[in-house]
């Protein structure tokens, strides 16, 4: 499926360039090599994640490996954390113009999620040289209370 010098960066471009409907696309995980399910392909596309190309073959990442990589990256490559104002001061840019992904599921944060970090004084984390935060789903998943 090699596309040569014009290798598409994401699943939707790959489907368009190859003339393949998303439901017919078959990709393997770059980490564990298992075939991605239809739900994993859709989630990969919605999260705007980039394909990895090896020897002219595109790879994605399954849900389990994405979560595992998020945890590993956070533990191994965390640099420091700042409140929104500190991030804006360091980067000389508004957080609204920056691509900030969730450190767990890797989805790009939308304006409301960035606002929540600002309004609730939650820190953003510099991990592997990139700013990361929590999306709405992972935020609620990490703060759920266990009944006693």
UniProtKB/Swiss-Prot annotation:
- Record Pfam families: E6
Extra information: Belongs to the low risk human alphapapillomavirus family. The cancer-causing human papillomavirus E6 protein has a unique carboxy terminal PDZ domain containing substrate but low risk E6s do not possess this domain.
- Gene3D superfamilies, per the entry: E6 early regulatory protein (3.30.240.40)
Query: What is the documented function of this protein?
Result: Plays a major role in the induction and maintenance of cellular transformation. E6 associates with host UBE3A/E6-AP ubiquitin-protein ligase and modulates its activity. Sequesters tumor suppressor TP53 in the host cytoplasm and modulates its activity by interacting with host EP300 that results in the reduction of TP53 acetylation and activation. In turn, apoptosis induced by DNA damage is inhibited. E6 also protects host keratinocytes from apoptosis by mediating the degradation of host BAK1. May also inhibit host immune response.
**What is an annotated GO biological process for this record, any one?**
DNA-templated transcription
**What domain of life is recorded for the organism?**
Viruses
Q: What interactions and quaternary structure are annotated?
A: Forms homodimers. Interacts with ubiquitin-protein ligase UBE3A/E6-AP; this interaction stimulates UBE3A ubiquitin activity. Interacts with host TP53 and EP300; this interaction inhibits TP53 activity.
Q: Name one GO molecular function term.
A: DNA binding
Q: Which HAMAP family match?
A: HPV_E6 (MF_04006)
Q: Where in the cell is it found?
A: Host cytoplasm; Host nucleus
Stretches annotated zinc finger (unnamed): 29-65, 102-138
Name of the protein this chain belongs to: Protein E6
Task: Give me the Gene Ontology terms describing cellular component.
Answer: host cell cytoplasm; host cell nucleus
Q: Could you say which protein family the record assigns here?
A: Belongs to the papillomaviridae E6 protein family.
Q: Which UniProt keywords apply?
A: Activator, DNA-binding, Early protein, Host cytoplasm, Host nucleus, Host-virus interaction, Inhibition of host innate immune response by virus, Metal-binding, Modulation of host cell apoptosis by virus, Transcription, Transcription regulation, Viral immunoevasion, Zinc, Zinc-finger
Main localization (coarse): host cell
